[in-house]
């Protein structure tokens, strides 16, 4: 589209220069850029393009800000703050915040992004300082802004510091239920589950009823520890407190039980969920299909897909189809898997991804169906605009070497390198051995040069 070609044009010019100022000058000097009408959409797309390249992002941001008839929205400033913070350019981020403040553009969203980036860069004291200076941004210290700070600290593993700050603030800022849920999450993240339980009691002391999120956070902690007796205790407590677990809680437990090889127990819990009147959703059924497939209960998984989901009025998503395709391929039903792929292609809402195709590619390599392999790769790239990642290239190169298709494998190897995807040592080594066996000495030399 025209919009996309404008993005590509500016992006190409924005890569010239070693500093934001140089990039700004190179864009300002470009006659072709003078005719571009800058819009919010264009700026958003450019910032997204340069989310990992702060110099180009800031150069483009400054250039757009100087264009006649255009003024940055607060959202564009927030994106820029986030990019600078993510790339640990804290001085530049502070300067931008000061500029925003002069123009009265700082919102709580801005503050949240800046706090998170300060904490992520190990500067949690700066996040606290930002909260202390909220008044200078024309913002209030209230439960919402306090929660932002506490959440930021807890997510960076600073729950003790968050607690000390909360004890200082709670005399003049009233906490809400979310405040306590933040701490429950923070204590669990720090492996201090007793404190999380204690926070449940503290919550009740403040006249807040623990909700599904409060309990589910602790349940997730116990699931990760494979402490399922505690999980069941909490499920009983939730029901006794009139706060029944929801489908997300059940799905989490079921997945962890299956991962711990407790498949039967996981399936029993699905029955408990249904008996409790808890309605299944798409992620629940996706997990169930995956678990049944892994347990070798092929027909039951097919029944869930073909009968249970439609009967429950639950729609399928990409993940549902991906699980089914992987399972069908694993059991050698490639034609059925292909018909599901075609069904996805003709049904509107589905966005196919790499996971849709990889089991099929693997099956082609296993059965030696090179025509189908070629067609699938063609569909991936041309029909669905999907690109292969390092593991997909490795799968193909290894498989093609085993299938005696060295020339094709080497072609993919070259394609991979041209895209700046660095192959693993094993991939290079295997390809090298195979081409030597075929007396492809020129090719072998090129691979050896690359491996140096």
Regions found by a protein language model. Name each.
Residues 63, 99, 133, 168, ...:
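The canonical alpha-helical register within tetratricopeptide repeats
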């Amino acid at each position: 589209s025209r919009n996309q070609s404008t993005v590509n044009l500016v992006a190409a010019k924005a890569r010239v220069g070693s500093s934001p100022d140089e990039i700004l000058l190179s864009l300002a000097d470009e006659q072709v850029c003078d005719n571009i009408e800058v819009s919010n959409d264009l700026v958003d797309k450019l910032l997204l393009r340069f989310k990992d390249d702060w110099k180009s992002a800031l150069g483009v941001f400054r250039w757009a800000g100087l264009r006649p008839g255009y003024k940055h929205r607060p959202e564009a400033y927030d994106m820029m703050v986030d990019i600078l913070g993510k790339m640990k350019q804290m001085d530049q981020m502070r300067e931008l915040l000061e500029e925003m403040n002069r123009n009265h553009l700082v919102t709580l969203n801005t503050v949240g992004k800046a706090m998170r980036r300060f904490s992520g860069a190990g500067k949690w004291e700066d996040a606290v300082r930002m909260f202390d200076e909220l008044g200078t941004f024309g913002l209030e210290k209230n439960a919402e802004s306090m929660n932002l700070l506490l959440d930021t600290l807890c997510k960076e593993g600073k729950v003790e510091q968050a607690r000390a700050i909360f004890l200082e603030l709670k005399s003049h800022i009233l906490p809400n239920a979310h405040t306590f849920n933040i701490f429950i999450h923070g204590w669990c993240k720090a492996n201090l589950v007793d404190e999380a339980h204690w926070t449940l009691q503290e919550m009740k002391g403040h006249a807040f009823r623990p909700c599904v999120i409060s309990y589910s956070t602790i349940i997730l902690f116990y699931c990760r520890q494979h402490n399922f007796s505690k999980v069941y205790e909490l499920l009983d407590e939730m029901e006794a407190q009139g706060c029944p677990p929801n489908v997300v809680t059940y799905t989490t437990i079921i997945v962890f039980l299956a991962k711990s090889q407790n498949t039967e127990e996981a399936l029993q819990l699905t029955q408990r969920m249904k008996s409790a009147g808890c309605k299944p959703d798409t992620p629940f059924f996706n997990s169930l299909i995956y678990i049944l497939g892994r347990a070798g209960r092929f027909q039951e998984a097919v029944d869930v897909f073909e009968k249970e989901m439609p009967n429950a009025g639950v729609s399928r998503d990409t993940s549902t189809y991906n699980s089914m395709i992987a399972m069908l391929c694993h059991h050698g039903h490639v034609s059925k898997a292909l018909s599901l792929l075609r069904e996805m292609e003709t049904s509107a809402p589905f966005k196919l991804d790499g996971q849709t195709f990889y089991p099929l590619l693997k099956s082609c390599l296993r059965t030696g169906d090179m025509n189908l392999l070629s067609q699938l790769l063609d569909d991936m790239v041309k029909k669905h605009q999907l690109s292969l990642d390092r593991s997909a290239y490795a799968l193909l190169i290894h498989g093609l070497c085993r299938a005696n298709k060295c020339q094709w494998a080497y072609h993919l190897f070259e394609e991979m390198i041209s895209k700046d995807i660095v192959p693993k040592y094993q991939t290079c080594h295997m390809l090298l051995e195979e081409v030597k066996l075929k007396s492809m000495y020129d090719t072998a030399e090129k691979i050896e040069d690359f491996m140096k």
